Regions:
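Single conserved hydrophobic/aromatic residue that forms the stacking wall/gate
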Residues: 1-8, 12
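Solvent-exposed, non-transmembrane regions of membrane-associated and secreted proteins
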Residues: 10, 14-266
Length: 266
């Protein structure tokens, strides 16, 4: 009889967790209508090629040759999203992992580990910026957190980049959209660390920033070196750091770094 009760209780817990997971999935599925892809990479590449073949191509060719070009655009209803949550600061998009979520910035780094974008308590939480970062992504390193959900939602898919770096090589560009601009970051490093490592240092001085990128190179499992980050470091260098838990009840974290390679005003 006791065993039957224990089994019944376990089934109830699993059912409750399953319902909560589904609520989280539904919440973010409903938000997708506020951010739709308007231009994919193939179409953008075709447009760049067409421009290069036109009569007035010299300036266009120079622009393309300077580096990677922004090739994805999202039609985002910023006003509607801000009305839902005043902490809304932008949208993150990475096509290979079907990662597409609003980003919030709270008054601490705890609240949005428990509450969704719609401020409903749920284990999915939200994708959120470190509260010490500037909401316009202007810090040298902007840290963005999300839960490692078992169903692969939120930042649960980031571990795929560690397990299969070919995903990065095929498409290394993470996009951040704000009301003011579009920013494209090239994934430059991936690794596992702990929650008290130098990864989470918010650097201030040029010396600290140089030390930080050297640290990344030393600890990274995957490292982009064309060109090497420390060799291309300038006062205009901007990074994003995506962080999620690695393993259940663990202090370890899966970390993905991206370096800003292109941006444009909206």
């Amino acid at each position: 009889e006791i065993l039957r009760c224990l089994v019944g209780s376990e089934m109830c817990i699993r059912d409750s967790l399953s319902r909560e997971y589904q609520k989280g999935i539904n919440t973010y599925a409903n938000l997708e209508k506020y951010a739709t892809v308007t231009q994919d990479s193939v179409k953008a590449a075709q447009e760049i090629g067409d421009t290069a073949d036109s009569e007035n191509t010299e300036e266009a060719v120079e622009e393309v040759s300077e580096g990677p070009q922004i090739a994805v655009d999202l039609d985002i209803d910023y006003d509607a999203l801000t009305k839902i949550n005043e902490d809304f600061v932008g949208w993150i998009y990475y096509a290979p992992l079907e990662l597409s979520y609003p980003i919030v910035r709270g008054i601490d780094n705890d609240y949005y580990t428990h509450y969704t974008f719609e401020n409903v308590r749920n284990s999915s939480g939200a994708i959120f910026m470190d509260f010490l970062n500037k909401p316009d992504f202007s810090h040298f390193n902007t840290i963005i957190y999300g839960h490692n959900m078992r169903n692969g939602t939120m930042f649960g898919s980031l571990k795929k980049l560690l397990n299969d770096p070919s995903i990065i090589k095929e498409d290394p560009y993470i996009y951040i959209f704000t009301k003011e601009k579009v920013m494209m970051y090239e994934i430059c490093a991936a690794y596992i660390t702990n929650d008290s490592s130098h990864t989470y240092d918010l650097t201030q001085t040029a010396e600290e920033q140089a030390d930080y990128v050297k640290y990344i190179r030393n600890v990274a499992t995957y490292y982009w070196d064309d060109p090497m980050l420390e060799e291309s470091l300038t006062e205009d260098t901007r990074l994003i750091t995506l962080s999620t838990c690695h393993g259940l009840h663990s202090n370890n974290r899966t970390v993905i770094h991206g370096v800003l390679v292109a941006s444009k005003n909206r």
